[in-house]
Amino acid sequence: MPNRHRGEIEAEIGGFRRTLVLTLGALAELEAAFGEGDLLALAERFAKGRMSARDLVHIIGAGLRGAGESVTDEEVARMASPDGAEGYVRIAAALIEATFGTADA
C-alpha cells in the first residue's frame, strides 16, 4: 500500500500494480531530463499541464526508479497501461500531485 505522506502512489503498468514515488534523486533526474535548473522551475513546467509522450516516460520512469525498481526509460516506454494513453497521463498527474500537491492545498 502506498504511503501518501511520502508522496507514493500505486498504479497498474506493465501488467503489475507498482509503487511510484518522486524521491529527491528522481526529481534531480527530471530536472536534468527537462533542462530545468531547480524544483520551482520543474513544478512550474508541470503546472502548465502539457506533457509529451516522452515527458510521460521520463516521469513514470523516475517514479518507478524512486520506488526502487531497476528500469530504463526504454523499458518504461514498452510497458502497457490498461487505460492506454489516458492511463499514462493519469499516472503522471497523480504522481506529480502526490509530490507537489495542488494549488488548492
Each language-model region and where it sits:
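Short, surface-exposed, low-complexity cationic segments
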Residues: 24-41
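A residue-level signal for conserved active-site and pocket-lining positions in enzyme catalytic cores
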Residues: 60
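Charged interaction scaffolds used for protein-protein
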Residues: 1-12, 17, 36-54, 65-105
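Short capping micro-motif at the N-terminus of alpha-helices
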Residues: 20-22
